[in-house]
């Protein structure tokens, strides 16, 4: 299946052709006839761990927020808590991390809502009846939003090789328990003939 890919040139002869202006215009084009006035728009992105630089910068996110507002939407930035221990495993630390990396109402023009609540236990269960899952868990604020818009950076991933848009939605929109369900497929497969019973694996 082929995807439509848009390219924004960095070349600009004046302010109206800047990358930021072009990003806002592209957002308007992509949302035209999809977004309804008054929609609560979840802008799903990754805020990064404190000091990490693998995230989309707030100045770019602000262009998307402004475009959504100009089209009558009510945007909020969101992500779900992580499964692993770190600075994004609960909503308080997650918000602190977002602020540390430059995300705040004053920098992006939209509130930040951690999608699965303080401890990662606010979710809705949805029946899908597919091969690997009969039911899935979706972070509550993602489920409750009228519209989902994702902003994704590409990164390396230990289990899949590459993480991007599918991971941002599939794993990133799941509460902690939903992430556990997805990671349940990754189980150790020790060679029993080499096992010495040390319990390290």
Stretches with model-predicted labels:
Residues 1-200:
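N-terminal and secondary-structure boundary signal
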């Amino acid at each position: 299946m082929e995807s439509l890919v848009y390219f924004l040139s960095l070349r600009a002869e004046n302010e109206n052709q800047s990358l930021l202006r072009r990003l806002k215009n592209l957002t308007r084009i992509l949302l035209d006839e999809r977004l309804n006035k008054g929609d609560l728009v979840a802008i799903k992105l990754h805020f990064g761990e404190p000091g990490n630089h693998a995230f989309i910068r707030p100045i770019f996110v602000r262009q998307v927020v402004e475009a959504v507002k100009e089209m009558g939407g009510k945007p909020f930035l969101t992500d779900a808590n992580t499964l692993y221990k770190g600075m994004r495993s609960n909503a308080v630390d997650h918000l602190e991390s977002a602020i540390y990396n430059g995300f705040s109402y004053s920098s992006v023009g939209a509130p930040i809502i951690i999608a699965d609540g303080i401890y990662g236990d606010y979710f809705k269960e949805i029946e899908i009846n597919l091969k690997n899952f009969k039911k899935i868990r979706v972070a509550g604020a993602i489920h409750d939003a009228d519209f989902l818009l994702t902003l994704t950076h590409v990164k390396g991933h230990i289990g899949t090789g590459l993480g991007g848009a599918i991971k941002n939605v599939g794993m990133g929109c799941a509460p902690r328990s939903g992430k556990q369900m997805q990671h349940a497929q990754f189980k150790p497969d020790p060679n029993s003939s080499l096992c010495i019973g040390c319990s390290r694996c």
